[in-house]
Amino acid sequence: PNAANQTFNLTNGEVFLWRDLWPALADVLDVDTGPDEPLDLAAYFSERIDTWQSLAATHGLIETNLMRLLGESHHYANLCFAHGAVASPPPALVSTIKIKQAGFTDTHNTEASFCHWLSVLRDQRFIP
């Protein structure tokens, strides 16, 4: 009842930096981390369409068309990672007081959650 017709800031509440997550994500995916430098994901993935088709065939993945799999996410990631910006943006911080007062208090570890969902995507053959 406290949540009816309300708008809430929804976040796990944990402040994190992507560069701190890369080693754990790489471990789940059985790959090495790359250099810590900016990367234009839209250009990167656009240049690897044939590579994805080959990976998808080799690993029996569900989606062989990389652009269908990604949708617009690689463009959104460029925005979130501030690709091309002169300086890194500050972490996005929002107040979660209102949502907690309405009774939504559950939280999840960010690294563990990302690792879990990458494992699910792998198990369901969306990624190799």
Regions inferred by a protein language model and the residue ranges of each:
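Mid/C-terminal beta-alpha module of Rossmann-like enzyme folds, strongest
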Residues: 1-82, 95, 124
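Glycine/small-residue-rich pyrophosphate-binding loop that anchors the diphosphate of NDP-sugar donors
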Residues: 90
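C-terminal/domain-terminus segments
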Residues: 100-128
